[in-house]
Regions:
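Acidic catalytic/metal-coordinating carboxylates
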Residues: 34-37, 58-63
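The feature encodes the CheY-like receiver
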Residues: 12, 57, 80
Length: 93
């Protein structure tokens, strides 16, 4: 399974990369600092899943996920450590 990671925190990006890369059937095909970069990586590489932080600069994970779904690029999976109901409801739409 080919996976792209998008998070504005370098420690989170590297941690996720290390965990995912240790799994035999998973391959990290790209790492992005924001949603716009993640969308471009999905367009460039055949990707199965994009792990997206909800809150990022330039383009957040919710907007990136909408584009990925509209263009049928990959399956987005949104991640957050925030407990904000409004943000969660926006992501579920």
């Amino acid at each position: 399974m080919k996976i792209i990671i998008a998070d504005d925190d370098s420690i989170i990006r590297e941690g996720l990369k290390m965990i995912i890369s240790s799994q035999p059937d998973f391959e990290v095909t790209g790492i992005a600092c924001n949603g716009a970069e993640a969308v471009e990586l999905c367009r460039k590489y055949k990707t199965d899943i994009a792990l997206l932080d909800i809150r990022m600069l330039v383009m957040d994970g919710i907007e990136a996920a909408k584009i990925m779904l509209e263009e049928n690029l990959c399956k987005p999976l949104l991640l957050t450590t925030f407990d904000e109901q409004e943000l969660i409801q926006r992501a579920l739409k």
